[in-house]
Each structure stands twice: as C-alpha cells, then as structure tokens.
UniProtKB/Swiss-Prot annotation:
Cited InterPro entries: NDK-like_dom, NDK-like_dom_sf, Nucleoside_diP_kinase, Nucleoside_diP_kinase_AS
Keyword terms: ATP-binding, Cytoplasm, Kinase, Magnesium, Metal-binding, Nucleotide metabolism, Nucleotide-binding, Phosphoprotein, Transferase
Catalytic EC class: transferase
Name assigned to this protein: Nucleoside diphosphate kinase
Cited PANTHER family: NUCLEOSIDE DIPHOSPHATE KINASE (PTHR11349)
Domain of life from the UniProt record: Bacteria
Family membership noted in the UniProt record: Belongs to the NDK family.
Lineage of the organism: Bacteria, Pseudomonadati, Myxococcota, Myxococcia, Myxococcales
Enzyme Commission code(s) on record: 2.7.4.6
Binding site for ATP: K11, F59, R87, T93, R104, N114
Role summary: Major role in the synthesis of nucleoside triphosphates other than ATP. The ATP gamma phosphate is transferred to the NDP beta phosphate via a ping-pong mechanism, using a phosphorylated active-site intermediate.
Cofactor: Mg(2+)
Length: 147
C-alpha cells in the first residue's frame, strides 16, 4: 500500500466544541499520524484562495464566512492510503448521511458545520498540503509501539 499525505482541517465548529484532541485521536487510532499541525485563524483571502474551486457555487460566500468565523486546526496526516482513510474516518459530507462512528456523524451539526475537511484525491491533497504547509514545515517520523 502507498504511504500518502493528506490535508485535514478541523473547522471552527470543531475547535469551538473543544474536540480537537478527540478528532486527532481518531486519526491516530486508524493509523494516520500528524506530520504537521497548526492552530490558526484563516483570513478571508486564505479561505477564498483555498476554496476557489467553489467560487461559482451558491454556498461559497457562506463557506468563506464560516471558515473565517473562528480558529481552525490545519494538519498534514500521513499513512497508508491516507486520502481514502481520512475520508472514511470523517464520514459523508452531510452528517445525516454519515455512518455511525465517523467524525461527522458523532460531532457535526449540519452540512455546513460538518467539523472537518479532508482532501478528496491524492492530486488535490498535494495541492492543499502545499497551500498551507511549505515542505520545511512537514516532519516525518516513525511511531514507536507502546509495550
């Protein structure tokens, strides 16, 4: 299996609920390790640039407003098939359609406040990771198994 990197964002609703540690724990329990992590407040320009692919969509303005409404946690996750695994752990975009035990089913409010973002393809993961993290800020390391 391929070792990949993917971008994960804990959105403002996840930060506000105080579940950052729970979310990171779920990724780690499923074999995805954070190799870069940062708590930040996105500017309007950063959010518009990151979500530019949705600019023509009717929800774009609300998405930018929400993503700049409070702090977010930006992470690069690394592991086998990280992109697909991350999406599986997050669950469906609409929490009402998400499987039990996924982050969105357990913590999200609605399709807008759905707690987390994850890259949707290996190609987009590379673009998204580089948008927020220059390579120098990403640190590879090996996990040591606890006895």
């Amino acid at each position: 299996m391929a070792i990949e990197r993917t971008l994960s964002i804990i959105k403002p609703d996840g930060v506000e609920k105080g579940i950052i540690g729970k979310i990171i724990g779920r990724f780690e329990e499923k074999g995805l390790k954070p190799v870069a992590i940062r708590l930040t407040q996105l500017s309007k320009a950063e959010a518009e640039g990151f979500y530019a692919v949705h600019k023509a969509r009717p929800f774009f303005g609300d998405l930018v407003k929400f993503m700049t409404s409070g702090p977010v946690v930006l992470m690069v996750l690394e592991g086998e098939n990280a992109v697909a695994r991350n999406r599986e752990i997050m669950g469906a975009t609409d929490p009402k359609k998400a499987d039990a035990g996924t982050i969105r089913k357990d913590f999200a409010t609605d399709i807008e406040k759905n707690t987390v973002h994850g890259s949707d393809s290996v190609e987009n993961a590379k673009i998204e990771v580089s948008y927020f993290f220059p390579e120098v800020q990403v640190h590879a390391y090996e996990w040591k198994k606890l006895a």
